[in-house]
Structures are given as structure tokens and as C-alpha cells.
């Protein structure tokens, strides 16, 4: 199982790198994209982080029976510490490149390893905030704000069902970042919500827009598809 892949310049050499979770290996891998990517032998896999399945913290919410003990997923890119280099966010952690093919790992929430991840400036000033939500299961959506060397957790949505689509964007163009998320359930979920939470720049979300209801979206994207300057949603149905 390889769930979640992400590209970015994580080592600061000006070239695009690839990171991915390999749940079968219980490892997050980093690799530089070779000049000839067709040949398998040109790829050098560098372990960033390895987890183990002999125990886990009590996790937020409830999960399907097929979830493995201490399974990690979710990936996002952001400059978390403001040093100008892109960092990796995922599995309730964030990872910083140290040089010489080494990374540090930094815990955000050890009780939310099996989650979708995103990061952005939801509170003006300071480090970007991190948002985690359950991708498979029922659990809250949390925002984490860096305060006094601690990731302070704030509940944003009390209960999300399989929120496998998640992003931070400025949807309404007011300069404050917003959260977009969409739910899904195998077999279909009549209450599945595709929703924008409109931010106020202070970590609050006083207004929301429900874009659709009853349409299950799996790992979908929000992006300007037609070049008209506003954001569109590319949805992948998940109701089979």
C-alpha cells in the first residue's frame, strides 16, 4: 500500500523532489526525481520516518476495522518554520530537511496519525496553521496553532465523516484563508457535505458555504480549472 504522494523542493536545491508514505514498509520516503525516471535503478529511496505497529496513542474518533495499528497517512507542503524551505506535513507530524539526506520529525498530534493534512496562514502572523481531519472514519476536524512552542489544538468541526478531501484556500478573495473539505463513504452517504469554511484571519470560521450535499468526493481538488480567476472543484465520486 502506497497512500499519498507529494512533490516539492524539500532539500532546497531548486529541483522537484517526491515524498510518499509506503504503509507496507511503515515508512515515509523521500527521493530526488532522476534525469531518466523510467529506469527503476535511477531512483534512490531515502527513509524520512518510520513508524511501528506494536502500539499507538488513543486516536481521535472511530475508524474502520481495516485500519492498521498506528497507521500513518496524509501529506501536505508548507514552510512551517519560516526558513524559506518547504517542509513536509503528514501523519500528525511535520518534517524538516537537515541536510545530508537527514530529516527531523516534529509531533503535532500523536493521536491523529491516520488523517488528511493541510497547512496555511489561517491566523495572520506567526507560523502557518496545520489542519487535520479523518480521511476514513468519524472524527473532528482540528486546527493547530503554534503558541509558545506548542501546537495548540482547536476543534473546527465536531464530526466529519470520511473527510478525504481537504485544502486551505482563499475562496472568497478577502485576503483571509478558508478551509475546504468534502466527505465520502463507501456505498454512498446521503449527508456527505462539500463545504467551505470562511475564515476571518484570526482562526475563526463564522460563515460557511455548502457547495453540495449527498455527493461523495474522494481525494478531490480545488483549483482554478478554467483560468477565470476563481476556484473550481474537481471531484472524484466515491459511492460505489
Model regions and ranges:
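Beta-propeller-forming repeat regions
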Residues: 1-240
Amino acid at each position: 500500500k502506497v497512500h499519498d504522494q507529494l512533490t516539492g523542493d524539500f532539500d532546497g536545491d531548486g529541483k522537484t523532489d517526491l515524498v510518499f508514505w509506503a504503509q507496507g514498509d511503515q515508512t515515509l520516503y523521500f527521493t530526488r526525481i532522476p534525469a531518466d525516471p523510467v529506469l527503476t535503478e535511477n531512483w534512490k529511496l531515502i527513509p524520512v520516518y518510520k513508524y511501528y505497529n506494536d502500539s499507538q496513542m488513543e486516536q481521535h474518533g472511530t475508524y474502520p476495522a481495516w485500519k492498521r495499528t498506528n497507521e500513518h497517512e496524509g501529506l501536505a507542503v508548507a514552510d512551517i518554520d519560516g526558513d524559506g524551505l518547504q517542509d513536509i506535513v503528514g501523519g500528525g507530524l511535520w518534517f524538516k530537511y537537515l541536510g545530508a539526506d537527514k530529516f527531523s520529525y516534529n509531533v503535532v498530534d500523536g493521536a491523529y496519525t491516520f488523517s488528511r493534512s493541510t497547512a496555511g496562514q489561517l491566523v495572520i502572523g506567526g507560523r502557518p496553521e496545520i489542519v487535520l481531519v479523518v480521511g476514513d472514519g468519524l472524527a473532528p476536524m482540528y486546527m493547530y496553532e503554534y503558541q509558545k512552542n506548542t501546537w495548540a489544538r482547536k476543534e473546527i468541526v465536531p464530526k466529519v465523516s470520511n473527510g478525504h478531501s481537504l485544502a486551505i484556500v482563499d475562496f472568497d478573495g478577502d485576503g483571509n484563508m478558508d478551509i475546504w473539505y468534502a466527505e465520502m463513504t463507501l456505498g454512498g452517504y446521503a449527508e456527505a457535505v462539500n463545504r467551505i469554511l470562511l475564515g476571518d484571519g484570526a482562526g475563526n470560521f463564522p460563515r460557511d458555504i455548502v457547495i453540495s450535499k449527498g455527493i461523495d468526493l474522494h481525494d478531490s481538488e480545488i483549483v482554478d480549472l478554467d483560468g477565470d480567476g476563481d476556484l473550481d472543484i474537481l471531484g472524484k465520486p466515491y459511492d460505489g
